C-alpha cells in the first residue's frame, strides 16, 4: 500500500502519518449512552474518559445509578463509536502514558456491538481501553461468546465487580444469580486478561467475614488479578431512587466504618495485588 492510500472506517479516515475526518460510508452502530465523565481518576489506570452506558439487568440494593437500568430510557443519548471517540480525543493530552477510555454503566456488555466498535477503533489509534462490568450478561452461548472473544482482543483491562461470593446472598442483594459471573472470572483468568477485582462493602449485606474469606479463596484461584479494591458503600445515589418513586432498600444502613474497611482489606489481602504497578 502506498503512503498516500487511505482506508475508511466509519467517521475516521486512516492514513499513514495522520488521522483525518471523513464522511460516514457505512451504517454506524448506535449505543444508548447515559452520561460521560471527561476526567475520571478511579475507574482504571491514569486519567480516564468514562462512558456510562444505559441498561442493567441487576437491581443492586446499593445502586447509585438506578436511572441507568432501562436500556431504552428516553433520556439516554444516541451515540456512535466515532462520535464518542472524537469527543474523548479532546482530552487525550491529560491521559499521559496510562490513561484512556473506560466504558462503564449500567452494564456495558448489554451493548456489546457498540463496545466492539468503540474499542476496536480506539486501539487502532493507540488508546488504552478499560471495561467496567459486573459480568451478568456473559454466556458461552452464541452469538454472545464470539462477540465477547472479539471484544477482549481490543480490551486492555477489565474492572470486574463481584458483589457477593455466595449465590443466595447475591440474589438477595442484586436480584440475580452469580453463577455466570464467576464463570466469567474464571474465563478471564484462563485467557490471562488483566483484571481489577472490585467489591462493594455493604454493612449487613456483604460485610461478613465468612463471605469475605470465601471471596479471598476464590480470587486466589485466578492468575490474572492485578489489583483488589474495596469500594465502601455510600448513600450518594439515594436521591435518585426517591426521584424515580422507588423505595430505597438500604434505608437506615450507614457506610462501613474505617475499622470494617480495614478488616475487609486484610481478609482479601489487597496489599498483595500489585500487578497494576508494573503495567
Give residue spans per PLM region:
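Conserved AdoMet/S-adenosylmethionine-binding subsite of the radical SAM
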Residues: 89-93, 97-100, 105, 109-236, ...
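Auxiliary Fe-S-binding modules of radical SAM enzymes
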Residues: 9-42, 196, 201-279
Amino acid at each position: 500500500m502506498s503512503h498516500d492510500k487511505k482506508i475508511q472506517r466509519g467517521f475516521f479516515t486512516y492514513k499513514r502519518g495522520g488521522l483525518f475526518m471523513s464522511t460516514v460510508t457505512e451504517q454506524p452502530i448506535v449505543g444508548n449512552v447515559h452520561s460521560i465523565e471527561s476526567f475520571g481518576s478511579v475507574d482504571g489506570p491514569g486519567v480516564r474518559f468514562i462512558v456510562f452506558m444505559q441498561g442493567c439487568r441487576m437491581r443492586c440494593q446499593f445502586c447509585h445509578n438506578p436511572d441507568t437500568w432501562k436500556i431504552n430510557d428516553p433520556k439516554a443519548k444516541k451515540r456512535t463509536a466515532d462520535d464518542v471517540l472524537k469527543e474523548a480525543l479532546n482530552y487525550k493530552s491529560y491521559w499521559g502514558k496510562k490513561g484512556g477510555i473506560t466504558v462503564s454503566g449500567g452494564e456495558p456488555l448489554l451493548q456489546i456491538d457498540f463496545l466492539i466498535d468503540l474499542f476496536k477503533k480506539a486501539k487502532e489509534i493507540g488508546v488504552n481501553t478499560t471495561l467496567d462490568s459486573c459480568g451478568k450478561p456473559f454466556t458461552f452461548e452464541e452469538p454472545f461468546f464470539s462477540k465477547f472473544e472479539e471484544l477482549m482482543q481490543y480490551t486492555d483491562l477489565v474492572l470486574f465487580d463481584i458483589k457477593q461470593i455466595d449465590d443466595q446472598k447475591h440474589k438477595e442483594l442484586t436480584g440475580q444469580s452469580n453463577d455466570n459471573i464467576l464463570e466469567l472470572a474464571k474465563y478471564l483468568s484462563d485467557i490471562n486478561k488483566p483484571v481489577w477485582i472490585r467489591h462493594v462493602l455493604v454493612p449487613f449485606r456483604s460485610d461478613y467475614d465468612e463471605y469475605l474469606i470465601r471471596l479471598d479463596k476464590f480470587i486466589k484461584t485466578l492468575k490474572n488479578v492485578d489489583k483488589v479494591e474495596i469500594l465502601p458503600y455510600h448513600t450518594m445515589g439515594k436521591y435518585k431512587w426517591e426521584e424515580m418513586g422507588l423505595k430505597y432498600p438500604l434505608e437506615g444502613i450507614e457506610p462501613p466504618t474505617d475499622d470494617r474497611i480495614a478488616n475487609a482489606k486484610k481478609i482479601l489481602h489487597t496489599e498483595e495485588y500489585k500487578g497494576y504497578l508494573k503495567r
